[in-house]
Amino acid sequence: DGIADASKKFSDATYPIAEKFDWGGSSAVAKYIADASASNPRQAALAVEKLLETGLTMDPKLVRAAVAAHSKALDTAVSNPKLVASKEDFAAVNEALARMIASADKQKFAALRTAFPESRELQSSLFAGNNGYEAEKAYDSFKALTSAVRDASINGANAPVIAEAARSERYVPDGPVGRAAKKFSEATYPIMEKLNWVKSPEISKYLATASSKDPKMMAPGIDKTLEVALTMNQNLINNAVYAHVRAIKGALNTPGFVAERDDFARVNLALAKMIGSADPAKFKALLTAFPGNADLQMALFAANPEQAKAAYETFVALTSAVV
């Protein structure tokens, strides 16, 4: 079909560029991760919200297929010094993404092109050192693929149905997981609301250094995350995504980007239920999958040791309820 043909031509044209790129040690990518949200935090938060909203208009089966394609590509990439996937896996990822995008709401997806701060500068940096002919050929194939996706668009027709609670509706937990999630939220919210999510030095430092410091560890961590997601209930994933969208909308109205208490609780409950649907062994492996994760958590809770202890106890109880 049109997407298959166009995505193959796009992959053929772009792989020579992709395989020359050092995905693990790129200063351009590391700099963007470190600087983009810090330079324009509100736009970055809005972009994440738009990204999640667009994801909720996509066909869940095609989203799952794209996740699986990325996971397979990472399996081959981690054995490459530059974290470059095989040409076959690279092509499979591009086709899966094209089909997934074709299922999205066209207007919402189009808005993503300019949603992230300084994304044009990042793209320019990535292509600056490439052969001009190769870059032009890649861009032409990208335009052709864009046209094929546009022609195949179903404009969100297969989007999942999500039951939306009115913002005025109070959060009422139900069942053992719900009650444990409520206690966890009550114990952790006093800590969370004191954090400045716009300018937190601990989070900025982690984002700036984790992937560039140890890319060979970060890539397997992402791969394991994708593998775990493939074992989860899709409806519960959708509910967790929607809970985050709702929380971000409320957080954007506060100086430190802190979500409202009820939205924070809804996010925790949605995540707990989603995690409860995952393969237990695969999820447990995530606890130590990302480099520096334990150090980040210690830094975030160091300012409030007494509250942190109480929060940890409710976390243990929530974990028991979920598992």
Curated annotation (Swiss-Prot):
**Keyword Ribonucleoprotein belongs to the record:** no
Record's keyword terms, sorted: Chlorophyll, Chloroplast, Chromophore, Light-harvesting polypeptide, Plastid, Repeat
Q: Which domain of life is it from?
A: Eukaryota
Recorded hits in Pfam families, A to Z, give: PCP (PF02429)
**Coarse class of the protein's main subcellular location:** plastid
Is this entry keyworded Plastid? yes
Protein localization? Plastid, Chloroplast
- GO molecular function of the protein, one example? chlorophyll binding
Site (Chlorophyll a binding) location in chain: 70, 244
Whereabouts are the sequence repeats? 1-173, 174-323
Q: Which InterPro entries match?
A: Peridinin-chlorophyll-bd_prot (IPR003376), Peridinin-chlorophyll-bd_sf (IPR036550)
Give me the Gene Ontology terms describing cellular component.
chloroplast; light-harvesting complex
Tell me, how does this one assemble?
Answer: Homotrimer.
User: According to its UniProt entry, what is the function of this protein?
Assistant: Water-soluble antenna for capture of solar energy in the blue-green range. Peridinin is an asymmetric carotenoid.
Q: What is known of its domains?
A: The mature protein is composed of 2 almost identical repeat units.
Its protein name is Peridinin-chlorophyll a-binding protein 3
**Organism per entry:** Amphidinium carterae
